[in-house]
Structures are given as structure tokens and as C-alpha cells.
């Protein structure tokens, strides 16, 4: 499963991309507003940070004609742009039109298998089920992912399932186990995913042992101790 980051804050993208785990970025009008930046400028900067990565940029028009025009304009900003469209009749119409011109699309705000199938038939590159928001209704967001993926596999549908509305690391695990092709993850959740108390405890133990071996404080890195480290397993 690929990882996208769900943000329009360039510093967050830069930090997580340095880990070597990102395949793309998703944005939406709310995230762009929160960033306080010009939309086109942000997309260009993201493209430089994540070369080759998919960058979802959402249209704001509500009618098909407006979505198509805006989608073409946004797609022209950079070859990495994926035009993000709402899962509405107008959004499906725009998806079909943009796809026919070779423009990649991400149909978002998906909350059911029938909706996902419609997006796929309209030619969507990605369809984005909202895991967290489905959970909020009392249904199981990860089960929705599983059912969509099963339907796509059975129908030999190439549209990728992009798990969105990720709230915590367990949502990422659930999406992976349900067969999602991509999870778009907020910065905060990435920082939660990388941490585990046993990892830090193990590191502290290794460094304390190293300090004893070298007669140095635990803060002294091996490179400054002057001798070869003794490898301790377990």
C-alpha cells in the first residue's frame, strides 16, 4: 500500500518526504485555505518536493461544465496533478470528460460501494472512501474499503482505492488489511506511526550499554567514542 500525505503545508510534506515513504500528496480547498498560500504556488512547490508523486488538487466548481474547465486549468499546472472531483452526478460527468482527455482524476467523498462503482465506470484513476467519517456514522470504514476492493478485483477494475479520512495509525493498518491501494495520511498520524515506547526504550538501553563500554555518558555518539562499538542483540 502506498502512502500519500494529506496536507497543503509544505514544511510537513518536506519533513515526511525526507523519510523516504511518500508516493504522493492530497489537498483540498480547506487545506489550501488553512495553509494561507496561493493554490497554484503550493502545487508547484509540492511537485518539486515529491518529484513523480501524484498531487490531488480539488476543483471548487459544483457544475459539470465548471468542473471540467477548472480541472483542465489545474491539470495544466503540472504533469503530476490529479484532479480531485466530488462524487456527485456533475463530478462523474466531469470525471468522464477529463479522463477522455488523459487527465488523471481522484473522485472523493465516497461512502458506499455503489458510489465507488460509479466512479470507476466514469474512469476515475482513484476513488477515495472516507474511513473516519464512515466510522462516525456507526458503520465500519475498513469494511467499506474491503468491499470496494473485492468488487474491483472481481470486476477487473483498475481504479485504485485511496483510503481517506484517516484519523489514527490503526486506520492505516485497517486500510492495508482491507486491500487499499493507497492511504492518504495526515502529518500528525505519520508522527504517531513512527513512534513506539519499546523502540525508544530499546534505543535508550543500547546507548546506555555503549556508554558503559566506552566510559562515556549515554549522550556520547559512537562516532565520538574512538573505538568500534560492541553489537548487542535483543
Curated annotation (Swiss-Prot):
InterPro entries named in the record: Aldolase_TIM, TAL/FSA, Transaldolase_3B, Transaldolase_3B/F6P_aldolase, Transaldolase_AS, TSA/FSA_arc/bac
Q: Which GO terms describe its molecular function?
A: aldehyde-lyase activity; transaldolase activity
Could you tell me which pathway this protein works in? Carbohydrate degradation; pentose phosphate pathway; D-glyceraldehyde 3-phosphate and beta-D-fructose 6-phosphate from D-ribose 5-phosphate and D-xylulose 5-phosphate (non-oxidative stage): step 2/3
Broadest EC class assigned to this enzyme:
transferase
Q: Spell out the Gene3D superfamilies in the cross-references.
A: Aldolase class I (3.20.20.70)
Show the Pfam families listed in the entry. Answer: TAL_FSA
The entry's localization annotation reads: Cytoplasm
| Active site location | 84 (schiff-base intermediate with substrate)
**Per the record, what are the reactions this protein catalyses?**
D-sedoheptulose 7-phosphate + D-glyceraldehyde 3-phosphate = D-erythrose 4-phosphate + beta-D-fructose 6-phosphate
Principal place of residence: cytoplasm
Give the EC number(s) under which this enzyme is classified. 2.2.1.2
Concerning its family, UniProt says: Belongs to the transaldolase family. Type 3B subfamily.
Which PANTHER family does the protein's record reference? FRUCTOSE-6-PHOSPHATE ALDOLASE 1-RELATED (PTHR10683:SF40), TRANSALDOLASE (PTHR10683)
The protein here is known as Probable transaldolase
